[in-house]
Swiss-Prot record:
It comes from the Bacteria. Belongs to the bacterial ribosomal protein bL9 family. Binds to the 23S rRNA. Gene3D superfamilies: Ribosomal protein L9, C-terminal domain, Ribosomal protein L9, N-terminal domain. It comes from Corynebacterium urealyticum (strain ATCC 43042 / DSM 7109). InterPro entries: Ribosomal_bL9, Ribosomal_bL9/RNase_H1_N, Ribosomal_bL9_bac/chp, Ribosomal_bL9_C, Ribosomal_bL9_C_sf, Ribosomal_bL9_N, Ribosomal_bL9_N_sf. Keywords: Ribonucleoprotein, Ribosomal protein, RNA-binding, rRNA-binding. One of its GO terms (cellular component) is ribosome. This is Large ribosomal subunit protein bL9. GO terms for molecular function: rRNA binding; structural constituent of ribosome. Disulfide bonds: none annotated. SUPFAM superfamilies: L9 N-domain-like, Ribosomal protein L9 C-domain.
Amino acid sequence: MKLILTTAVDKLGVPGDIVEVKAGYGRNYLLPRGYAIVATRGAEKQIKDIQRAKADRVIRDQEHAEAVKAELEALSAVQVPVRTAQGGKLFGSVTSADVVAAVERAGGPKLDKHAIKLPKNSIKNTGKYAVDVKLVSGMTANLEFAVVDADK
Protein backbone atom coordinates (compact mmCIF):
# COMPACT_ATOMS: atom_id res chain seq x y z
CA MET A 1 0.00 0.00 0.00
CA LYS A 2 1.44 3.34 -1.05
CA LEU A 3 0.93 6.18 1.47
CA ILE A 4 2.06 9.76 2.01
CA LEU A 5 3.06 10.53 5.59
CA THR A 6 1.45 13.57 7.22
CA THR A 7 3.40 13.33 10.49
CA ALA A 8 6.77 11.90 11.47
CA VAL A 9 6.57 8.15 12.14
CA ASP A 10 9.48 6.33 13.82
CA LYS A 11 11.43 4.03 11.48
CA LEU A 12 9.24 5.05 8.54
CA GLY A 13 9.80 8.69 7.59
CA VAL A 14 8.94 12.34 7.93
CA PRO A 15 5.93 14.33 6.67
CA GLY A 16 5.75 14.35 2.89
CA ASP A 17 7.57 11.05 2.39
CA ILE A 18 5.92 8.54 0.07
CA VAL A 19 6.25 5.10 1.68
CA GLU A 20 5.25 1.54 0.80
CA VAL A 21 3.77 -0.37 3.78
CA LYS A 22 1.78 -3.54 4.30
CA ALA A 23 -1.94 -3.06 3.76
CA GLY A 24 -2.95 -3.94 7.32
CA TYR A 25 -0.44 -1.52 8.89
CA GLY A 26 -1.69 1.26 6.66
CA ARG A 27 -5.42 0.57 7.04
CA ASN A 28 -5.44 -0.24 10.76
CA TYR A 29 -2.78 2.09 12.16
CA LEU A 30 -1.52 4.89 9.91
CA LEU A 31 -4.75 5.99 8.18
CA PRO A 32 -7.14 5.98 11.21
CA ARG A 33 -4.71 7.99 13.33
CA GLY A 34 -4.14 10.55 10.57
CA TYR A 35 -0.44 9.74 10.25
CA ALA A 36 -0.77 9.20 6.49
CA ILE A 37 -3.02 9.62 3.48
CA VAL A 38 -3.44 7.34 0.49
CA ALA A 39 -1.00 8.24 -2.29
CA THR A 40 -2.92 9.37 -5.36
CA ARG A 41 -1.64 11.45 -8.26
CA GLY A 42 -3.43 14.52 -6.88
CA ALA A 43 -2.09 13.98 -3.37
CA GLU A 44 1.45 13.47 -4.67
CA LYS A 45 1.25 16.74 -6.63
CA GLN A 46 -0.11 18.55 -3.57
CA ILE A 47 2.75 17.21 -1.40
CA LYS A 48 5.33 18.34 -3.97
CA ASP A 49 3.78 21.83 -3.99
CA ILE A 50 3.89 21.96 -0.19
CA GLN A 51 7.53 20.81 -0.13
CA ARG A 52 8.46 23.43 -2.74
CA ALA A 53 6.81 26.19 -0.68
CA LYS A 54 8.50 24.92 2.48
CA ALA A 55 11.89 24.95 0.74
CA ASP A 56 11.44 28.69 0.11
CA ARG A 57 11.17 29.28 3.87
CA VAL A 58 14.03 27.02 4.95
CA ILE A 59 17.33 28.52 6.06
CA ARG A 60 19.85 26.79 3.80
CA ASP A 61 23.20 27.15 5.59
CA GLN A 62 25.17 29.17 8.15
CA GLU A 63 25.92 32.05 5.76
CA HIS A 64 22.28 32.31 4.74
CA ALA A 65 21.29 32.23 8.43
CA GLU A 66 23.65 35.13 9.19
CA ALA A 67 22.17 37.14 6.29
CA VAL A 68 18.63 36.45 7.52
CA LYS A 69 19.65 37.40 11.08
CA ALA A 70 21.06 40.73 9.91
CA GLU A 71 17.94 41.38 7.84
CA LEU A 72 15.63 40.58 10.78
CA GLU A 73 17.51 42.73 13.26
CA ALA A 74 17.55 45.63 10.77
CA LEU A 75 13.75 45.65 10.50
CA SER A 76 12.29 48.45 12.57
CA ALA A 77 8.73 48.99 11.37
CA VAL A 78 7.23 45.56 12.04
CA GLN A 79 3.67 46.07 13.21
CA VAL A 80 1.07 43.42 13.97
CA PRO A 81 -2.39 44.99 13.52
CA VAL A 82 -5.11 43.37 15.65
CA ARG A 83 -8.63 44.19 16.77
CA THR A 84 -8.73 45.46 20.33
CA ALA A 85 -11.22 46.41 23.00
CA GLN A 86 -10.96 49.53 25.12
CA GLY A 87 -7.75 49.72 27.09
CA GLY A 88 -5.65 47.94 24.48
CA LYS A 89 -6.77 44.38 25.32
CA LEU A 90 -6.85 42.06 22.32
CA PHE A 91 -9.70 39.89 21.12
CA GLY A 92 -7.69 36.67 21.29
CA SER A 93 -3.89 36.71 21.20
CA VAL A 94 -1.02 37.23 18.77
CA THR A 95 0.25 33.97 17.23
CA SER A 96 3.54 33.14 15.57
CA ALA A 97 1.72 33.08 12.21
CA ASP A 98 0.65 36.70 12.81
CA VAL A 99 4.28 37.68 13.48
CA VAL A 100 5.50 35.88 10.33
CA ALA A 101 2.87 37.67 8.21
CA ALA A 102 3.85 41.04 9.73
CA VAL A 103 7.55 40.42 8.98
CA GLU A 104 6.74 39.63 5.34
CA ARG A 105 4.53 42.77 5.07
CA ALA A 106 7.42 44.84 6.44
CA GLY A 107 9.71 43.54 3.70
CA GLY A 108 11.52 40.94 5.77
CA PRO A 109 12.46 37.38 4.83
CA LYS A 110 10.06 34.46 4.66
CA LEU A 111 10.11 32.54 7.93
CA ASP A 112 8.63 29.32 9.23
CA LYS A 113 6.07 29.98 11.96
CA HIS A 114 7.65 27.25 14.09
CA ALA A 115 10.91 29.23 14.23
CA ILE A 116 9.27 32.04 16.24
CA LYS A 117 9.65 31.62 20.02
CA LEU A 118 6.78 33.54 21.62
CA PRO A 119 6.84 34.45 25.33
CA LYS A 120 5.49 31.89 27.82
CA ASN A 121 2.47 34.04 28.63
CA SER A 122 0.67 34.87 25.39
CA ILE A 123 0.58 38.37 23.89
CA LYS A 124 -2.83 39.83 24.76
CA ASN A 125 -2.17 43.59 24.94
CA THR A 126 -0.97 46.25 22.53
CA GLY A 127 2.60 47.43 22.90
CA LYS A 128 6.18 46.59 21.93
CA TYR A 129 7.48 43.04 22.18
CA ALA A 130 10.66 41.13 21.37
CA VAL A 131 10.85 37.48 20.33
CA ASP A 132 13.63 35.10 19.40
CA VAL A 133 13.69 33.53 15.94
CA LYS A 134 15.54 30.20 15.71
CA LEU A 135 17.48 30.16 12.43
CA VAL A 136 19.83 27.17 12.68
CA SER A 137 21.01 25.20 15.69
CA GLY A 138 22.81 27.57 18.01
CA MET A 139 21.83 30.76 16.15
CA THR A 140 18.87 32.94 17.00
CA ALA A 141 17.88 36.42 15.92
CA ASN A 142 16.10 38.98 18.06
CA LEU A 143 13.00 40.46 16.42
CA GLU A 144 11.21 43.48 17.82
CA PHE A 145 7.66 44.28 16.77
CA ALA A 146 4.71 46.38 17.89
CA VAL A 147 1.18 45.13 18.40
CA VAL A 148 -1.13 47.95 17.30
CA ASP A 149 -4.87 48.53 17.02
CA ALA A 150 -6.03 47.73 13.47
CA ASP A 151 -8.82 50.33 13.63
CA LYS A 152 -6.50 53.29 14.24
